[in-house]
């Protein structure tokens, strides 16, 4: 049973909240047209498939729990455990307002969870790419931070092979605009600082 649809993504993925046997899941699917995506379905499928090793390799208490991946009718689906909470990202204005109106101590805890996750990411041999406010959820009732999107994280060593890399400009370091530049733990430190400004600025 589908109880929620997210079809306004610019990534080429369409996402669903589903329920089966009393358990809720979040499904990310590439291979169908979405309202905001201008690329090809093939590219969307390729990108989602390339994120599979990231979710298989990174296991952290604040990272959304990966369940399985499937090829379906020429498309590709990734299944995660559903989590409740508000998204920090401005693309969901009502949730963003609730998030930014959290008590200072809650926002401080979110920031601590982000720092811990970035430290874990680096120690696991990955660099955060396209990590921004839309990647963060918070369940105020249970005081739980969830990182819900690490699709574009890169295995180290990583070099900028795009010029303008994926991501929100508010959270991107200078090297994420410079073709051939190293993308490393310094990039993650810049990202952490950007989150501090976003949460407390």
Question: Which ranges hold each PLM region?
Answer:
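Conserved HxN/HPN-centered segment at the entrance to the catalytic loop
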Residues: 58-69
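Conserved end of the kinase activation segment
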Residues: 175-185
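Conserved activation segment of eukaryotic-like protein kinases, specifically the C-terminal portion
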Residues: 161-176
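Conserved protein kinase catalytic/activation segment
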Residues: 135-150
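Activation segment signature within eukaryotic-like protein kinase domains
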Residues: 110-111
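Catalytic-loop of the protein kinase fold
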Residues: 118-139
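ATP-binding glycine-rich loop module of kinase domains
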Residues: 11-54
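Conserved short submotifs of the Hanks-type protein kinase catalytic core
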Residues: 73-87
């Amino acid at each position: 049973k589908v109880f929620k649809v997210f079809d306004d993504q610019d990534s080429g993925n369409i996402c669903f909240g589903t329920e089966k046997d009393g358990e809720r899941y979040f499904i990310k699917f590439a291979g169908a047209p979405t309202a905001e995506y201008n690329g090809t379905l093939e590219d969307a499928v390729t990108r989602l498939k390339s994120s599979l090793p990231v979710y298989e390799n990174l296991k952290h208490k604040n990272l959304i729990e990966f369940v399985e991946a499937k090829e379906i009718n020429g498309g590709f689906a990734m299944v995660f455990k559903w989590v409740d909470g508000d998204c920090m990202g401005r693309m969901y204005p009502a949730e963003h307002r609730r998030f930014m109106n959290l008590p200072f101590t809650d926002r401080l805890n979110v920031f601590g969870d982000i720092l811990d996750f970035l430290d874990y990411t680096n120690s696991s041999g990955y660099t955060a790419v396209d990590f921004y406010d839309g990647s963060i959820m918070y369940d105020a009732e249970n005081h739980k931070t969830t990182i819900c999107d690490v699709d574009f994280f890169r295995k180290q060593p990583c070099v900028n092979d795009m010029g303008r890399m994926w991501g929100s400009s508010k959270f991107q370091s200078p090297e994420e605009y410079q073709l051939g530049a190293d993308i490393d733990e310094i990039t993650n430190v810049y990202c952490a600082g950007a989150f501090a400004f976003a949460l407390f600025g």
